[in-house]
Amino acid sequence: DGIRDIGVTGVQTCALPISSPRGVVAGIIPSTNPTSTAIFKILIAIKSRNAIVLSPHPSAVKCIAETARLMRDAGVREGLPPDAVQCLTRSALEGTETLMKHKMTAVILATGGIGLVRAAYSSGKPAFGVGPGNVPVFVERSADIAKAVRDILSGTCFDNGTICASEQAVVADTPIAKALREEDRKSTRL
């Protein structure tokens, strides 16, 4: 019962390679959660051995550029090539479109409105798009229920619950649904 590792281990539980570096990642960053999204995209690009170029929303250029600088500097201190993290500093729609269609761009991570996500999907490059949504969280039967409730409340309240990644709905594994509901009621009493 519960979560199983499917597709991660092979015969005799030997690890199988499941990915390889792709090249340059185009990271399109919104204004609604600019720093956390920039950090997340930089980390997943670098952890997967890819370079990343961020294209910030015009109203968040300064904070995204500073976040990219801080992340790049921290990485360089640990041996990251200095050009592995880049950020467009004069953001405009044309720059984002050029980045998405550039011959060196291998994959696009687009976070923003539906128009931006559609543009990423129609760029001719592999793209992962995230737009506005009703974000669910799944609590599995083996979870520490008290910790799960604390984490859900923390995530829901982060940045006043305004980011598209904030938990908006909870889906509970049937065996723990009642206990989860009771813990939530207990934790949210004023």
Language model features: what each stretch is:
Residues 1-14, 186-190:
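Single conserved hydrophobic/aromatic residue that forms the stacking wall/gate
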Residues 15-17, 86-105:
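A structured beta-alpha segment of the ubiquitous adenosine-cofactor-binding alpha/beta core
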Residues 36, 54, 86-89, 109-112, ...:
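General beta-strand structural signal in soluble alpha/beta enzymes
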Residues 17-73, 78, 114, 123-127, ...:
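Conserved small-residue-rich beta-alpha loop and adjacent elements
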Residues 96-107, 113-118, 122, 150:
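Active-site/ligand-binding-proximal alpha/beta "capping" segment
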Residues 90-94, 114-116, 134:
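Short acidic loop-to-helix transition motifs that present clustered carboxylates
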Residues 39, 44-47, 117-189:
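ALDH superfamily catalytic-core signature
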